[in-house]
Amino acid sequence: ELDQMTLPPCHYSFQCYVADGELSLMWNQRSADLFLGVPFNISSYGLLLLLLCETTGLKPGTLIGSFGDTHLYQNHITAAKTQLTREQHALPTVKLSNVDILNGEFNVELIDYKHEPAIKAPLSN
């Protein structure tokens, strides 16, 4: 499948840690595109943490990302500057239902999700 991908996967592993009834998750990436990739990676691993907690009955702990080649592409600088001027909104509440993590089935509802208009940026490699 790697030969069919536009880019090789940037993230390659994650580990979980349990302490005091909380589940924490840390993931590793060889490369981190700060504008297009990292925000998606944060939300994806955050969702994985919540799904694992829903499955195990543990409470969410800390989410940690470890990045190797961390970069902001030249053709993303204007978009990133625009992002920095945007109003910050409170995080939404994530509601999970029908979670069957072993079969990859679940429903996600974002409650009170507020956002600014999309900012387009080209994919770089």
Enumerate the predicted regions with their spans.
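Active-site helix-to-loop segments that bind/position phosphate- or nucleotide-bearing substrates
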Residues: E1-N125
